[in-house]
Amino acid sequence: MLNTLIVGASGYTGAELALYLNRHPQMNITALMVSAQSVDAGKLISDLHPQLKGIIDVPVKPLTDAEEAAKGVDVVFLATDHKVSHDLAPVFLAAGCTVFDLSGAFRVQDAEFYRRYYGFEHQHPDWLAKAVYGLAEWRAESVKQAQLIAVPGCYPTAAQLALKPLLDAQLLNPAQWPVINAVSGVSGAGRKASMTNSFCEVSFQPYGIFNHRHEPEISTHLGTPVIFTPHLGNFARGILETITCRLQPGVTQQDVAEAYHNAYHDKPLVRLYDKGVPALKSVVGLPFCDIGFSVDGEHLIVVATEDNLLKGAAAQAVQCMNIRFGFPETQSLI
Protein backbone atom coordinates (compact mmCIF):
# COMPACT_ATOMS: atom_id res chain seq x y z
CA MET A 1 0.00 0.00 0.00
CA LEU A 2 1.40 3.37 -1.06
CA ASN A 3 0.66 6.54 0.87
CA THR A 4 -0.33 9.31 -1.51
CA LEU A 5 -0.94 13.03 -1.28
CA ILE A 6 -2.94 15.17 -3.71
CA VAL A 7 -2.06 18.87 -3.84
CA GLY A 8 -4.62 21.01 -5.65
CA ALA A 9 -7.40 18.65 -4.67
CA SER A 10 -10.19 21.23 -4.84
CA GLY A 11 -9.97 21.70 -8.61
CA TYR A 12 -11.70 19.64 -11.27
CA THR A 13 -8.65 17.50 -11.96
CA GLY A 14 -7.86 17.12 -8.27
CA ALA A 15 -11.36 15.81 -7.60
CA GLU A 16 -11.02 13.26 -10.41
CA LEU A 17 -7.69 12.15 -8.98
CA ALA A 18 -9.24 11.74 -5.54
CA LEU A 19 -12.00 9.56 -6.97
CA TYR A 20 -9.59 7.30 -8.87
CA LEU A 21 -7.12 6.96 -6.01
CA ASN A 22 -9.81 6.42 -3.38
CA ARG A 23 -10.90 3.24 -5.15
CA HIS A 24 -7.39 2.05 -5.98
CA PRO A 25 -6.58 -1.05 -3.90
CA GLN A 26 -2.87 -0.16 -3.67
CA MET A 27 -3.23 3.50 -2.70
CA ASN A 28 -3.94 5.16 0.63
CA ILE A 29 -4.80 8.87 0.44
CA THR A 30 -3.06 10.48 3.40
CA ALA A 31 -4.31 14.00 2.69
CA LEU A 32 -6.04 16.24 0.18
CA MET A 33 -4.40 19.65 0.12
CA VAL A 34 -4.73 23.11 -1.39
CA SER A 35 -2.59 26.22 -1.15
CA ALA A 36 -2.59 27.94 2.22
CA GLN A 37 -4.35 30.97 0.70
CA SER A 38 -7.12 28.97 -0.98
CA VAL A 39 -10.68 29.86 -0.05
CA ASP A 40 -11.40 26.11 -0.19
CA ALA A 41 -9.04 25.24 2.67
CA GLY A 42 -10.89 23.48 5.47
CA LYS A 43 -13.95 22.62 3.40
CA LEU A 44 -15.04 19.06 2.74
CA ILE A 45 -14.12 17.98 -0.76
CA SER A 46 -17.61 16.50 -1.02
CA ASP A 47 -19.07 19.97 -0.40
CA LEU A 48 -16.90 21.38 -3.19
CA HIS A 49 -17.70 18.45 -5.49
CA PRO A 50 -21.06 16.96 -4.47
CA GLN A 51 -20.58 13.89 -6.67
CA LEU A 52 -18.11 12.74 -4.00
CA LYS A 53 -20.68 12.79 -1.15
CA GLY A 54 -20.66 9.49 0.68
CA ILE A 55 -17.48 8.51 -1.15
CA ILE A 56 -14.82 10.96 0.04
CA ASP A 57 -16.07 13.13 2.89
CA VAL A 58 -12.79 14.61 4.11
CA PRO A 59 -11.58 18.21 4.34
CA VAL A 60 -9.00 19.71 2.03
CA LYS A 61 -6.14 20.96 4.17
CA PRO A 62 -4.00 24.05 3.61
CA LEU A 63 -0.45 23.24 2.56
CA THR A 64 1.73 25.37 4.80
CA ASP A 65 4.88 23.23 4.98
CA ALA A 66 5.71 20.92 2.07
CA GLU A 67 8.57 19.21 3.93
CA GLU A 68 6.22 18.32 6.76
CA ALA A 69 3.50 17.20 4.36
CA ALA A 70 5.97 14.85 2.64
CA LYS A 71 6.64 12.81 5.78
CA GLY A 72 5.43 9.24 5.37
CA VAL A 73 4.27 9.91 1.80
CA ASP A 74 5.34 7.72 -1.12
CA VAL A 75 3.52 9.38 -4.03
CA VAL A 76 2.51 12.99 -4.66
CA PHE A 77 0.15 14.23 -7.35
CA LEU A 78 0.45 17.94 -8.14
CA ALA A 79 -2.73 19.29 -9.71
CA THR A 80 -1.47 22.81 -9.27
CA ASP A 81 -0.55 25.91 -11.25
CA HIS A 82 2.65 25.63 -13.28
CA LYS A 83 4.72 27.92 -11.07
CA VAL A 84 3.40 26.26 -7.91
CA SER A 85 4.41 22.83 -9.22
CA HIS A 86 7.79 24.24 -10.25
CA ASP A 87 8.37 25.32 -6.64
CA LEU A 88 6.82 22.33 -4.84
CA ALA A 89 8.03 19.37 -6.87
CA PRO A 90 11.72 19.63 -5.84
CA VAL A 91 10.72 19.69 -2.15
CA PHE A 92 8.75 16.46 -2.44
CA LEU A 93 11.41 14.88 -4.64
CA ALA A 94 14.12 15.71 -2.11
CA ALA A 95 12.02 13.92 0.50
CA GLY A 96 12.10 10.77 -1.63
CA CYS A 97 8.56 10.96 -2.99
CA THR A 98 7.65 9.96 -6.52
CA VAL A 99 5.93 12.97 -8.08
CA PHE A 100 3.33 13.06 -10.84
CA ASP A 101 3.04 16.66 -11.96
CA LEU A 102 -0.07 17.55 -13.96
CA SER A 103 1.12 21.09 -14.69
CA GLY A 104 3.41 22.15 -17.51
CA ALA A 105 6.36 22.88 -15.24
CA PHE A 106 8.57 19.96 -16.32
CA ARG A 107 7.18 18.88 -19.71
CA VAL A 108 9.73 20.43 -22.06
CA GLN A 109 13.47 20.30 -21.40
CA ASP A 110 14.20 23.83 -22.56
CA ALA A 111 14.52 26.78 -20.19
CA GLU A 112 13.66 29.27 -22.94
CA PHE A 113 10.33 27.51 -23.41
CA TYR A 114 9.32 28.49 -19.87
CA ARG A 115 10.41 32.08 -20.27
CA ARG A 116 8.44 32.46 -23.49
CA TYR A 117 5.29 30.44 -22.85
CA TYR A 118 4.92 30.30 -19.07
CA GLY A 119 6.40 33.62 -18.03
CA PHE A 120 8.92 32.42 -15.44
CA GLU A 121 12.57 31.46 -15.23
CA HIS A 122 12.99 27.75 -14.61
CA GLN A 123 15.12 27.33 -11.49
CA HIS A 124 15.51 23.55 -11.46
CA PRO A 125 17.49 22.48 -14.56
CA ASP A 126 18.58 19.20 -12.95
CA TRP A 127 15.01 18.06 -12.33
CA LEU A 128 13.93 19.40 -15.70
CA ALA A 129 16.55 17.15 -17.31
CA LYS A 130 15.51 14.13 -15.22
CA ALA A 131 11.76 14.51 -15.70
CA VAL A 132 10.10 11.86 -17.85
CA TYR A 133 7.29 12.95 -20.15
CA GLY A 134 4.41 10.69 -19.24
CA LEU A 135 2.72 9.96 -22.56
CA ALA A 136 1.77 6.58 -21.16
CA GLU A 137 1.35 4.56 -24.36
CA TRP A 138 4.74 5.64 -25.69
CA ARG A 139 6.97 6.22 -22.65
CA ALA A 140 6.15 3.29 -20.38
CA GLU A 141 9.72 2.00 -20.03
CA SER A 142 11.00 5.45 -19.07
CA VAL A 143 8.10 6.00 -16.67
CA LYS A 144 9.00 2.78 -14.84
CA GLN A 145 12.37 4.28 -13.88
CA ALA A 146 11.32 7.85 -13.12
CA GLN A 147 10.95 9.78 -9.88
CA LEU A 148 9.41 12.82 -11.59
CA ILE A 149 6.75 12.22 -14.23
CA ALA A 150 5.49 15.24 -16.18
CA VAL A 151 1.96 14.33 -17.22
CA PRO A 152 1.28 15.68 -20.74
CA GLY A 153 -1.19 18.47 -21.42
CA CYS A 154 -4.74 17.69 -22.50
CA TYR A 155 -4.46 18.88 -26.09
CA PRO A 156 -0.97 17.37 -26.58
CA THR A 157 -2.14 13.96 -25.36
CA ALA A 158 -4.79 13.57 -28.06
CA ALA A 159 -2.62 15.15 -30.75
CA GLN A 160 0.36 12.93 -30.09
CA LEU A 161 -1.65 9.74 -29.76
CA ALA A 162 -3.23 10.55 -33.13
CA LEU A 163 -0.04 11.52 -34.98
CA LYS A 164 2.81 9.49 -33.52
CA PRO A 165 1.92 6.15 -35.20
CA LEU A 166 1.76 7.89 -38.58
CA LEU A 167 5.07 9.67 -38.11
CA ASP A 168 6.85 6.57 -36.84
CA ALA A 169 5.61 4.62 -39.87
CA GLN A 170 6.76 7.50 -42.14
CA LEU A 171 3.33 7.77 -43.73
CA LEU A 172 3.07 11.57 -43.68
CA ASN A 173 4.43 13.93 -46.33
CA PRO A 174 6.84 16.27 -44.48
CA ALA A 175 6.15 19.03 -47.01
CA GLN A 176 2.82 19.69 -45.27
CA TRP A 177 2.72 20.24 -41.53
CA PRO A 178 -0.15 18.53 -39.69
CA VAL A 179 -2.92 21.04 -38.97
CA ILE A 180 -4.64 20.48 -35.63
CA ASN A 181 -7.97 22.16 -34.93
CA ALA A 182 -8.93 21.33 -31.37
CA VAL A 183 -11.96 22.14 -29.22
CA SER A 184 -12.05 21.85 -25.43
CA GLY A 185 -14.81 22.17 -22.89
CA VAL A 186 -14.80 25.05 -20.43
CA SER A 187 -13.47 22.88 -17.60
CA GLY A 188 -10.09 23.13 -19.33
CA ALA A 189 -9.89 26.69 -18.02
CA GLY A 190 -10.14 25.45 -14.44
CA ARG A 191 -12.64 25.94 -11.64
CA LYS A 192 -11.83 29.55 -10.79
CA ALA A 193 -14.52 31.94 -11.98
CA SER A 194 -13.73 34.35 -14.79
CA MET A 195 -15.59 36.36 -17.40
CA THR A 196 -14.38 34.02 -20.15
CA ASN A 197 -15.94 30.92 -18.65
CA SER A 198 -19.09 32.44 -17.15
CA PHE A 199 -22.33 30.93 -18.45
CA CYS A 200 -23.55 33.96 -20.39
CA GLU A 201 -20.16 34.72 -21.94
CA VAL A 202 -19.10 31.26 -23.11
CA SER A 203 -19.06 30.97 -26.89
CA PHE A 204 -17.42 28.77 -29.49
CA GLN A 205 -14.23 30.62 -30.37
CA PRO A 206 -10.54 30.11 -31.17
CA TYR A 207 -7.84 31.43 -28.86
CA GLY A 208 -4.06 31.38 -28.54
CA ILE A 209 -3.59 31.46 -32.31
CA PHE A 210 0.07 30.74 -33.14
CA ASN A 211 1.14 31.29 -29.53
CA HIS A 212 -0.54 28.62 -27.41
CA ARG A 213 1.97 26.85 -25.14
CA HIS A 214 0.73 23.42 -26.21
CA GLU A 215 1.93 23.89 -29.79
CA PRO A 216 5.64 23.73 -28.90
CA GLU A 217 4.91 20.89 -26.46
CA ILE A 218 3.33 18.89 -29.28
CA SER A 219 6.04 19.77 -31.82
CA THR A 220 8.90 19.05 -29.43
CA HIS A 221 7.73 15.59 -28.48
CA LEU A 222 6.59 14.60 -31.96
CA GLY A 223 9.78 15.91 -33.53
CA THR A 224 7.91 17.72 -36.30
CA PRO A 225 6.28 21.15 -36.66
CA VAL A 226 2.50 21.41 -36.44
CA ILE A 227 -0.07 24.17 -36.81
CA PHE A 228 -2.25 24.07 -33.71
CA THR A 229 -5.37 26.14 -33.13
CA PRO A 230 -7.31 25.56 -29.90
CA HIS A 231 -10.96 26.53 -29.51
CA LEU A 232 -13.12 27.07 -26.45
CA GLY A 233 -16.31 25.05 -26.77
CA ASN A 234 -19.64 25.87 -25.17
CA PHE A 235 -19.78 22.61 -23.21
CA ALA A 236 -18.35 21.49 -19.88
CA ARG A 237 -15.78 18.83 -20.64
CA GLY A 238 -14.12 16.86 -23.40
CA ILE A 239 -11.69 17.51 -26.24
CA LEU A 240 -12.18 16.83 -29.93
CA GLU A 241 -9.30 17.32 -32.35
CA THR A 242 -9.62 17.27 -36.13
CA ILE A 243 -6.18 16.82 -37.67
CA THR A 244 -5.52 17.34 -41.37
CA CYS A 245 -2.44 15.71 -42.91
CA ARG A 246 -0.98 14.88 -46.29
CA LEU A 247 0.14 11.33 -46.94
CA GLN A 248 3.19 10.19 -48.81
CA PRO A 249 2.39 9.16 -52.40
CA GLY A 250 1.03 5.62 -52.55
CA VAL A 251 -0.03 5.38 -48.90
CA THR A 252 -3.45 3.74 -48.58
CA GLN A 253 -6.25 3.64 -46.03
CA GLN A 254 -5.07 0.14 -45.11
CA ASP A 255 -1.55 1.42 -44.43
CA VAL A 256 -2.93 4.00 -42.01
CA ALA A 257 -5.13 1.42 -40.29
CA GLU A 258 -2.16 -0.93 -39.89
CA ALA A 259 -0.02 1.83 -38.38
CA TYR A 260 -2.64 2.51 -35.74
CA HIS A 261 -3.24 -1.19 -35.07
CA ASN A 262 0.46 -1.89 -34.68
CA ALA A 263 0.81 1.00 -32.23
CA TYR A 264 -2.27 0.41 -30.10
CA HIS A 265 -3.48 -3.19 -30.38
CA ASP A 266 -2.22 -3.83 -26.84
CA LYS A 267 -2.95 -0.37 -25.40
CA PRO A 268 -6.23 -0.62 -23.46
CA LEU A 269 -6.91 3.11 -23.12
CA VAL A 270 -6.73 3.92 -26.83
CA ARG A 271 -9.77 2.82 -28.83
CA LEU A 272 -9.58 2.72 -32.62
CA TYR A 273 -12.53 3.11 -34.97
CA ASP A 274 -12.59 0.82 -38.00
CA LYS A 275 -15.46 2.86 -39.45
CA GLY A 276 -16.44 6.45 -38.86
CA VAL A 277 -14.96 8.85 -36.35
CA PRO A 278 -15.51 9.33 -32.61
CA ALA A 279 -17.79 11.80 -30.88
CA LEU A 280 -17.32 13.54 -27.54
CA LYS A 281 -20.22 11.71 -25.91
CA SER A 282 -18.30 8.44 -26.26
CA VAL A 283 -15.41 9.55 -24.03
CA VAL A 284 -16.77 12.06 -21.51
CA GLY A 285 -16.46 10.54 -18.05
CA LEU A 286 -14.16 7.78 -19.35
CA PRO A 287 -10.35 7.38 -19.41
CA PHE A 288 -10.01 6.63 -23.13
CA CYS A 289 -8.67 8.40 -26.19
CA ASP A 290 -10.74 7.42 -29.23
CA ILE A 291 -9.26 7.74 -32.73
CA GLY A 292 -10.85 7.47 -36.17
CA PHE A 293 -9.75 8.62 -39.61
CA SER A 294 -10.65 8.98 -43.27
CA VAL A 295 -8.45 8.97 -46.39
CA ASP A 296 -9.12 10.67 -49.72
CA GLY A 297 -6.19 10.23 -52.09
CA GLU A 298 -3.18 11.80 -50.40
CA HIS A 299 -5.35 13.63 -47.87
CA LEU A 300 -5.90 12.25 -44.37
CA ILE A 301 -8.20 13.55 -41.65
CA VAL A 302 -7.84 12.09 -38.17
CA VAL A 303 -10.32 12.72 -35.36
CA ALA A 304 -9.22 12.13 -31.76
CA THR A 305 -11.41 12.60 -28.69
CA GLU A 306 -10.81 12.38 -24.95
CA ASP A 307 -12.11 13.71 -21.67
CA ASN A 308 -9.77 16.62 -20.94
CA LEU A 309 -10.00 15.98 -17.19
CA LEU A 310 -9.36 12.24 -17.49
CA LYS A 311 -7.19 10.91 -20.32
CA GLY A 312 -6.06 14.52 -20.72
CA ALA A 313 -5.12 14.79 -17.03
CA ALA A 314 -6.15 12.64 -14.03
CA ALA A 315 -6.61 9.27 -15.74
CA GLN A 316 -3.28 9.54 -17.53
CA ALA A 317 -1.58 10.47 -14.26
CA VAL A 318 -3.02 7.37 -12.57
CA GLN A 319 -2.17 5.28 -15.64
CA CYS A 320 1.44 6.45 -15.32
CA MET A 321 1.38 5.70 -11.61
CA ASN A 322 0.18 2.15 -12.33
CA ILE A 323 2.97 1.70 -14.86
CA ARG A 324 5.56 3.18 -12.51
CA PHE A 325 4.76 0.81 -9.65
CA GLY A 326 3.96 -2.31 -11.66
CA PHE A 327 0.20 -2.36 -11.09
CA PRO A 328 -2.23 -3.34 -13.86
CA GLU A 329 -2.25 -0.37 -16.23
CA THR A 330 -6.00 0.26 -16.00
CA GLN A 331 -6.39 -0.43 -12.27
CA SER A 332 -9.07 1.85 -10.76
CA LEU A 333 -9.62 3.46 -14.21
CA ILE A 334 -12.02 0.97 -15.82
UniProtKB/Swiss-Prot annotation:
Subcellular location field: Cytoplasm
Protein name, as recorded: N-acetyl-gamma-glutamyl-phosphate reductase
Family designation: Belongs to the NAGSA dehydrogenase family. Type 1 subfamily.
CDD domains: AGPR_1_C, AGPR_1_N
Active-site residues from the entry: C154
Residues annotated as transmembrane: none
Top-rank lineage group of the source organism: Bacteria
Main subcellular location: cytoplasm
PANTHER family for the chain: N-ACETYL-GAMMA-GLUTAMYL-PHOSPHATE REDUCTASE, CHLOROPLASTIC-RELATED, N-ACETYL-GAMMA-GLUTAMYL-PHOSPHATE REDUCTASE, CHLOROPLASTIC-RELATED-RELATED
GO cellular component, one term: cytoplasm
Swiss-Prot/TrEMBL catalytic activity: N-acetyl-L-glutamate 5-semialdehyde + phosphate + NADP(+) = N-acetyl-L-glutamyl 5-phosphate + NADPH + H(+)
Entry GO MF terms: N-acetyl-gamma-glutamyl-phosphate reductase activity; NAD binding; NADP+ binding
EC number: 1.2.1.38
BP GO terms, sorted: L-arginine biosynthetic process
Keywords recorded for this protein, A-Z: Amino-acid biosynthesis, Arginine biosynthesis, Cytoplasm, NADP, Oxidoreductase
